[in-house]
UniProtKB/Swiss-Prot annotation:
Gene3D superfamilies registered for this protein in UniProt: 1.10.530.40
GO cellular component: host cell plasma membrane; membrane
Species name: Escherichia phage 933W (Bacteriophage 933W)
EC number: 3.2.1.17
Biological processes, Gene Ontology terms: cell wall macromolecule catabolic process; defense response to bacterium; killing of cells of another organism; peptidoglycan catabolic process
Protein name: SAR-endolysin
Catalysis performed (reactions): Hydrolysis of (1->4)-beta-linkages between N-acetylmuramic acid and N-acetyl-D-glucosamine residues in a peptidoglycan and between N-acetyl-D-glucosamine residues in chitodextrins
Length: 177
């Protein structure tokens, strides 16, 4: 079984990569699978009010309890958030990247942990120094949620471990060939 399949990338994500899809297409599919698309506000694992694919703000205003959006509005919000994440990658990652690599880094850094945690990270230092394998290893270290070790299944955050494996697989896509 290939390394990519072991890391649990879905058949849909693998098909997009095989077809030569763009980073926005790959990232959309990946985030739909990881975040879902909720048209009613909910609290995320950290207790923050979110909507759509994890947006915390809509039209410049914070998400509030009871907020509801149409699927079409969520699609627009999701596109804005996706494009911001990919623009962050283009601006801040100084090594050439493939489309799957852009999607993996966009999901991990700006989209999930946030730039404030990414900039001082070992991942960020390693990727920009050209140590791609080391950077991908460092993604997999981010497996705590609110201080809980997500490798312990009873902490109810094991999805974080799987997501980091998958983001690492995308961010390193093709470097082992």
């Amino acid at each position: 079984m290939s390394r990519k399949l072991r890391y649990g990338l879905s058949a849909a994500v693998l098909a997009l990569i095989a077809a030569g899809a763009s980073a926005p297409e790959i990232l959309d599919q990946f985030l739909d699978e990881k975040e879902g698309n909720h048209t009613t506000a909910y609290r995320d694992g950290a207790g923050i009010w979110t909507i759509c694919r994890g947006a915390t703000r809509v039209d410049g205003k914070p998400v509030i309890p009871g907020m509801k959006l149409s699927k079409e509005k969520c699609d627009r919000v999701n596109a804005i958030e996706r494009d911001k994440a990919l623009a962050w990658v283009e601006k801040n990652i100084k090594v050439p990247l493939t489309e799957p690599q852009k999607a993996g880094i966009a999901s991990f850094c700006p989209y999930n942990i946030g730039p404030g945690k990414c900039f001082p990270s070992t991942f960020y230092r390693r990727i920009n120094a050209g140590d791609r394998k080391g950077a991908c290893e460092a993604i997999r270290w981010w497996i705590k949620d609110g201080g809980r070790d997500c490798r312990i299944r009873s902490n109810n955050c094991y999805g974080q471990v799987s997501r980091r494996d998958q983001e690492s697989a995308l961010a390193c896509w093709g470097i082992d060939r």
